[in-house]
């Protein structure tokens, strides 16, 4: 089952990457969601640590790519009009309406100095649309300038991207975009409390990471969306400059500095982990590359997944599933599709403690568990003992768990026998119904029995007793052969007869039989890996006739005698 789930997840990943390369981002987004869900289910069932680490890393990679596409898709309809719609998309707090003339003059001098240095930078920063280079700042107020491609790139490169220790390692486009979103959100919070200097610094950091994401993004459409989003914070920096200059310098600017070594250490640790698993990444498709390169990487993989990835076509059942849920029509279609998933899926949380699951979790009773939580929460409904986690095997009946042997002992509680006799067309019917098969020494067994005697044979009484069988494996002979030695004993004989109804001839009788198990008997036992010693019990119930005319109907039940 785990291999089938993993195969479905990998085929969904291939389809998602194909849609991603074809710029069908709506379909790719939903396929990534479905693929991540299947890979998580496969991770729960996978027991090999190396495969668990690989699947976990790929789940994180696909989730980041999916989140990256979702954020950009939400802004794609506004890309044709970069000015007004983008300003309405971000809710910035208002700033004071007037500034001092001295600050305005200082800001104009700084802006003129920056514009003189723009010609020394040679890179490409995509623009959101056509900009009007002839517009100038008004004399009565301050408005953000409209920058062309070179000016936008110049503005981004003029920020402190080279001085930040956390950007020494080149981040991927997804990591850079996530960092940019975090800094932009932090800047908006600083602006809400009117800390314009801190907000400007956060916006500058966000623009740094936007530039890294733009340079690493190969798709022109996504580049354009990133450029539009970065331009919003560039313009906002220009608006906040005079207000940031009017604020006093903070007395302790070293407060955010301890975060930088921690961030650098975390990034270095993530970089080392990526290098350690680089040899296993060939079995999974990546985002950069064409379909041919994906197929080559799949065919050349050295792990056990190469047979799963050879078929690049999506299964017919999966195509019908996608067609029924209309993944191509809306971004919220996957949310509607999840209603058809089993309600027992707990979202990678333990059913007992509701905590996140680790890789060594187990799945039982249609739920996911920590191994320890399952052992203390669920016991066998038959023998009232916990389950062994080394080789977990259980049976479920009426939403209760049983050991396989205990489950077999709960079946066959009803037996019946029909006896015919020579020279008579009538029959003797004898049936017994037990309540259970687990008892302790000294306990009383109550069972109902029915005798329907249509013959002329007499049924004088009903007899019940326990038949104990002990089997020992012994080595005999010169060849050291193992042969069983069996010992059989009859214990606790008990009789039932009704003075007014027995002997029973051409009549029917229904009643209850109460049988007391001897208090000194030993429990059922199986010793040794090869069952070198076995102690078993059978409940024998029979109806008998006159001694001189042998007429016996016997029923046997396998019982389990528990330890006191």
Curated annotation (Swiss-Prot):
Residues 74-150, 245-286 are annotated as: Disordered. It comes from the Eukaryota. Residues 250-259 have a biased composition (Pro residues). Residues 270-285 have a biased composition (Polar residues). GO terms for molecular function: metal ion binding. Signal peptide: none annotated. InterPro entries: Arrestin-like_C, Arrestin_C-like, Ig_E-set, MIT_dom, MIT_dom_sf, Znf_LIM. Residues 348-413 form the LIM zinc-binding domain. Residues 74-146, 260-269 have a biased composition (Low complexity). Pfam families: Arrestin_C, LIM, MIT. This is Arrestin domain-containing protein E. It comes from Dictyostelium discoideum (Social amoeba). Disulfide bonds: none annotated. Keywords: LIM domain, Metal-binding, Zinc.
